[in-house]
Amino acid sequence: AHKADSIAGTTRSAEKAEALARMGIKPLIYAEGGFTPELTGTLREATHLILSIAPGENGDAVLAELSRHGRNAVPNLQWICYLSTVGVYGDHDCAEVTEESECRPISARSHRRLETEKAWSRFGSEIAVPVAILRLSGIYGPGRNAIVNLAEGAARRIVKPGQVFNRIHVDDIAGAARHLLDAKAHGTFNVSDDEPSPPQDVVALAAHLTGVEPPPEIPFEEAKLSPMARSFYSECKRVSNAKLKGLGYSLRYPNYREGLSALWKTGLWRG
């Protein structure tokens, strides 16, 4: 396995920079509109690059900056990983989707993600560096899960017959990225757990774990939702992770029951 001499990470806030430092990660403050000399220098030394910044209306600001200088900006780079979203597939009427399925994004943010995937892949080809595109399902983990929503009074059991969502624990995102890094893999990979599930079932489990009554079920037609929340319910698909598992990756949390139960038992659900 690859062992890093050092790891650096960007953040937009001083508070999160301190948290990175406590984890042994060199923190770098990132702000769109240009790289600091420290960030430019770190990129010149970097051998592996993992990106998760969402593209804006004008595209990916990091890619735009690197593209100005090409290989000279990242002379030691050996591998690029771009974290995208399964939202690029759009709606498939609850059918299974693989990496070969047609991408037909609905939202503007998913359209931008798809275009950015293509742009990073082109950049990798131009500088002869392999690029792995990781299409992530709905992320949960410490501080971001149904137990937190329940504790804050924000959890709702909205029922739309047949609707399922796909999920992935944050530990499995890190695990999959590390596995693909060690394999020097390139191409597109779905990063999702084994069990697409109705969202109301996840809230019910959170209530069971915490020993409280679950909130009442609300028919989708009667639910008051923000435009973004409603957009999620306009898409339904079952994301296959067979390609990732075919490369030998074993999920730490293959379904939401195991992931949520572990968060509760360890107390890490709070973040």
PLM-predicted stretches and their roles:
Residues 68-108:
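Conserved Rossmann-fold NAD(P)-dependent oxidoreductase catalytic core, especially the SDR/UDP-sugar
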Residues 39-82:
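NAD(P)-cofactor binding segment of oxidoreductase domains
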Residues 23-46:
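Conserved Rossmann-fold cofactor-binding substructure of NAD(P)-dependent oxidoreductases
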Residues 174-177, 182-229, 271:
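Mid/C-terminal beta-alpha module of Rossmann-like enzyme folds, strongest
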Residues 255-271:
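Amphipathic terminal alpha-helices
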Residues 93-133:
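Catalytic helix-loop patch of NAD(P)-dependent Rossmann-fold dehydrogenases
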Residues 204, 224-250:
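Conserved C-terminal active-site "lid" loop/helix of NAD(P)H-dependent oxidoreductases
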Residues 139-149, 158-181, 187:
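Substrate-positioning beta->alpha
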